[in-house]
Design a protein with these regions (language model features):
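Catalytic donor-sugar/metal-binding loop of nucleotide-sugar-dependent glycosyltransferases
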Residues: 135-155, 160-171
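Conserved core of the sugar-phosphate nucleotidyltransferase
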Residues: 27, 32, 55-149
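Cofactor-binding loop segments of dinucleotide-utilizing enzymes, especially the Rossmann-like FAD-
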Residues: 1, 52, 81
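Short phosphate-binding loop-to-helix
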Residues: 3-48, 56-60, 64
Length: 171
């Protein structure tokens, strides 16, 4: 974190927080930083965390997440995106030995049109009921809902290639 980033939103009516040094490292997790933040703030009904590295999340995406929490459908909501690869066709390689991870390859189930789709957190937002988060220290449980973000808006900027791709979307 740096002053330049922090000052970029100085004119907005939002509460800003600078992470302590131990949460501003490549090995620090977002979850650890959020749990520390929960300990520092006065409690609210819900807690929402929007990652600046995923800038193309829309207001409608955020509203969908908030609605799920308000309707008491869940304890937490996470922005999700479809994984483009067919995970069931994944293999491990040991030297030159191919080791299928799933049994699809051994059973001949290789047509990706008939294989279940998988999703992952998009990096856009994490929302949860305050008390649930304090007690469980995690956003994922049996009562977690997802808001699916289309791949075009699920750009999680972590590398130079990600920056170039994001720039190509706005220029």
């Amino acid at each position: 974190d740096c002053d330049k980033i922090f000052d970029a939103v100085a004119d907005l009516d939002v509460e800003r927080h600078i992470r302590p040094d131990h949460h501003a490292t490549v090995s620090a997790t977002v979850l650890d930083a959020m749990m520390d933040l929960l300990d520092e703030l006065e409690p609210y009904e819900t807690f929402s965390y929007f990652l600046p590295t995923c800038p193309f999340i829309s207001p409608d995406d955020i509203k969908k997440g908030i609605t799920k929490l308000q309707n008491r459908q869940c304890d937490s909501v996470v922005s999700m995106t479809q994984i483009p690869e067919t995970l069931q066709l994944a293999c491990l390689m040991s030297e030159d030995n191919v080791l299928p991870v799933f049994d699809n390859l051994e059973c001949g189930l290789t047509n990706s049109k008939f294989i279940k789709k998988y999703y992952k957190p998009s990096g856009g937002f994490y929302m949860g009921l305050w008390n649930y988060l304090k007690e469980n220290q995690n956003f994922f449980s049996r009562l977690t809902k997802g808001v699916i973000i289309p791949p075009a808006r699920s750009v999680d900027i972590n590398t130079i290639e990600d920056i170039k791709y994001a720039e190509s979307m706005i220029w």
